């Protein structure tokens, strides 16, 4: 049975990757279908009720700069906003928001339902239709076939998902949802390497049974940050506090006593869990010398009593979970509303993907999110946007696009995955980016919005706001460079009290701002130097561009050197055994990874600069030197 319409792009799955993929393809004008097993759970925050953080906030800003929905939804759902690393340099500052689950889901669903070119249909997908290595559609659980030349799979933890609580386990995509068994079996037939990963979630606690007076209060920032470049503080709902408590030796004894019934430590779970978000069992085992671990007590929303205790993800049996929770200060009488659990699921080796996130084996088939071995809403959303965009470009007959490592954290993410692969759930950090001084949260729009407009991702309202901001920044920089003050100027009397060393020669306003003791806000408040920019985002940009100009210029020069051969393409059909001069080790690694570019090849462990030189000579001799898109 065939559906009566044909689509340009089909997206399977309605989580963070799927929603961004569907919205991106539809914004670009492609007739798009989003298939989900349950329309009510579109945009569901399956684990922690928070968006952003170190590295992750950078991805959210990049999604936003390209017209995505995550940051906008966060502004409407965020019940506590904080800027992390605020005392450090701008490269590592990151926005994090505690979100109301219901408000977030509601906003995402509202955006989806009002997006032109997007159709939503409730059915689980069981099969792919593939003809001559080209995807041509999907088949749902009820045997209904949908036709499309481009399919984006964003299956999350649903592929052969297995939920573990103690030594008991059962099939599930997440708590309360069925797994995708038939689709997982179908995908295992494809020539793509498959593995198993694991993630987990903590028990949810009833706030009415917690004694918050024994915990440290953690308030949000003032003034309040916003997540979206189009956001406004007026969009935020009521703001509330989170709380901090700690485990103790008694907690650790309870956990150690239950390890014989832990699926992780009894060999029941095969999948590898996230290194940077370990279960409480893992923490106690790996950091045996620590007498306590911090726990963040995070509300799940404004109209629910559920609390997310961030830091005690566990798959221990329920009785052990209850005892360990009640051993924690402030939770002596706590009641669990939902037990914690671990979930194992299939993922596919991302080295079998192009950097467009299209599979190398099947034309038109794209993967995004946890299916590629990542963990986190933000990583999923960023991949979803890229996959949906490239699926749309493909059906329009246009070249694929992916930002380079020096252009976006999204570029770092995709390059790491498609070049190096991953054996454990991959999480983004600022430390993964070698050019992080240029890849800041504050300039994500300056880096990406013009490209997003060119690709068709950015609407008129965002483009107008961005253009106005860009113009105001440039005009203000010109003003600061063009206005001068000299030692005999009448402005000196107001200026010198704010300087560590009074000026002894003529100086531009720009030079004054570059002084360590001066910032833009302070300079603009001095008589004769204002008025400054009213837009805080534009003002921040002016300050950073002035104060860090030398460092930024130096990093840009490094990038210019590095990218000379970065985008030189490598044919996917190239057999590296045919390249004279390469060692057997290098041949094996290159044939295994099948890098798309010289840049990717150079980042594979064991590929030496000498091997890269040999490759470049071989390509030149064979007339194969070409620049990748």
Curated annotation (Swiss-Prot):
One of the Pfam families matching this protein, by short name: GIDA
UniProt-annotated binding residues for FAD: 13-18
Top-level taxon in the UniProt lineage: Bacteria
Residues where NAD(+) binds: 273-287
One GO term describing the cellular component: cytosol
Cofactor(s) this protein requires: FAD
Coiled-coil annotated spans: none
Subcellular localization(s) per the UniProt record: Cytoplasm
InterPro entries reported in the protein's UniProt record: FAD/NAD-bd_sf (IPR036188), GIDA_C_N (IPR049312), MnmG (IPR004416), MnmG-rel (IPR002218), MnmG-rel_CS (IPR020595), MnmG_C (IPR026904), MnmG_C_subdom (IPR047001), MnmG_C_subdom_sf (IPR044920)
Keyword field: Cytoplasm, FAD, Flavoprotein, NAD, tRNA processing
Keyword match Membrane: no
GO biological process: tRNA methylation; tRNA wobble uridine modification
An example molecular function term from Gene Ontology annotations: flavin adenine dinucleotide binding
Subunit structure: Homodimer. Heterotetramer of two MnmE and two MnmG subunits.
Family, similarity comment: Belongs to the MnmG family.
Role, per record: NAD-binding protein involved in the addition of a carboxymethylaminomethyl (cmnm) group at the wobble position (U34) of certain tRNAs, forming tRNA-cmnm(5)s(2)U34.
HAMAP family recorded: MnmG_GidA
Full protein name: tRNA uridine 5-carboxymethylaminomethyl modification enzyme MnmG
Source organism per UniProt: Shewanella baltica (strain OS195)
Recorded name of the encoding gene: mnmG
């Amino acid at each position: 049975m065939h559906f009566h319409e044909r689509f340009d792009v089909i997206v399977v799955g309605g989580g963070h990757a799927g929603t961004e993929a569907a919205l991106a393809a539809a914004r670009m004008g492609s007739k798009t279908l989003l298939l989900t097993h349950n329309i009510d759970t579109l945009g569901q925050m399956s684990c922690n009720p928070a968006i952003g953080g170190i590295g992750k906030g950078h991805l959210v800003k990049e999604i936003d700069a390209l017209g995505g929905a995550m940051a906008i939804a966060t502004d409407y759902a965020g019940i506590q906003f904080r800027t992390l690393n605020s005392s450090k340099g701008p490269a590592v500052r990151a926005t994090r928001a505690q979100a109301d689950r219901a408000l977030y889901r509601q906003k995402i669903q509202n955006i989806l339902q009002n997006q032109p070119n997007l159709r939503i249909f409730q059915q689980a997908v069981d099969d792919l239709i593939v003809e001559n290595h080209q995807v041509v559609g999907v088949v749902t659980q009820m045997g209904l076939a949908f036709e499309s030349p481009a399919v984006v799979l964003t299956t999350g933890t649903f592929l052969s998902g297995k939920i573990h609580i103690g030594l008991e386990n059962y099939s599930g995509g997440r708590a309360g949802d069925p797994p995708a068994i038939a689709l997982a079996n179908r995908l295992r037939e494809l020539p793509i390497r498959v593995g198993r990963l694991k993630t987990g979630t903590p028990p949810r606690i009833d706030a009415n049974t917690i004694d918050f007076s024994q915990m440290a209060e953690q308030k949000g920032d003032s003034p309040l940050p916003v997540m979206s470049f189009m956001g406004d503080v007026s969009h935020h709902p009521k703001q509330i506090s989170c709380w901090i408590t700690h485990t103790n030796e008694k907690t650790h004894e309870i956990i150690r006593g239950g390890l014989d019934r832990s699926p992780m430590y009894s060999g029941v779970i095969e999948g590898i869990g996230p290194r940077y978000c370990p279960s409480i069992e893992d923490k106690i085992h790996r950091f045996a010398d620590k007498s306590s671990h911090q726990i963040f007590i995070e509300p799940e929303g404004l109209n629910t009593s559920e609390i997310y205790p961030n830091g005690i993800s566990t798959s221990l049996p329920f009785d052990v979970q209850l005892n360990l929770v009640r051993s924690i200060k402030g939770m002596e009488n706590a009641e669990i509303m939902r037990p914690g659990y671990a979930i194992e699921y299939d993922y596919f080796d991302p080295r079998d993907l192009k950097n467009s996130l299209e599979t190398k084996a099947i034309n038109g088939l794209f993967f995004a999110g946890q299916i590629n071995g990542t963990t986190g809403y933000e990583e999923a959303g960023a991949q979803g946007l890229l996959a949906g965009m490239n699926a749309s470009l493909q059906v329009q007959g246009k070249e694929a696009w992916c930002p380079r490592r020096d252009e976006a954290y999204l570029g770092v993410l995709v390059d790491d995955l498609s070049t190096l692969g991953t054996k454990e759930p991959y999480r983004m950090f600022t430390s993964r980016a070698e050019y992080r001084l240029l890849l800041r949260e504050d300039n994500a729009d300056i880096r990406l919005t013009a490209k997003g407009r060119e690709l068709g991702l950015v609407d008129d309202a965002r483009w107008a706001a961005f253009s106005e901001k860009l113009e105001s920044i440039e005009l203000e920089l010109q003003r600061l460079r063009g206005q001068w003050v000299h030692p005999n100027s009448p402005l000196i009397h107001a200026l010198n009290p704010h300087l560590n060393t009074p000026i002894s020669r003529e100086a531009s306003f720009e030079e004054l701002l570059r002084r360590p003791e001066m910032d833009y806000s302070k300079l603009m408040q001095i008589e004769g130097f204002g008025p400054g920019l009213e837009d805080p985002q534009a003002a921040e940009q002016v300050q950073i561009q002035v104060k860090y100009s030398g460092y930024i210029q130096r990093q840009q020069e490094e990038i210019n050197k590095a990218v000379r051969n970065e985008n030189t393409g490598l044919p996917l059909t190239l057999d590296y055994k045919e390249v004279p001069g390469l060692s057997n080790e290098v041949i094996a690694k290159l044939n295994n990874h099948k890098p798309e570019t010289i840049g990717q090849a150079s980042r594979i462990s064991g590929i030496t600069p000498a091997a890269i030189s040999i490759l470049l000579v071989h390509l030149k001799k064979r007339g194969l030197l070409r620049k990748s898109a």
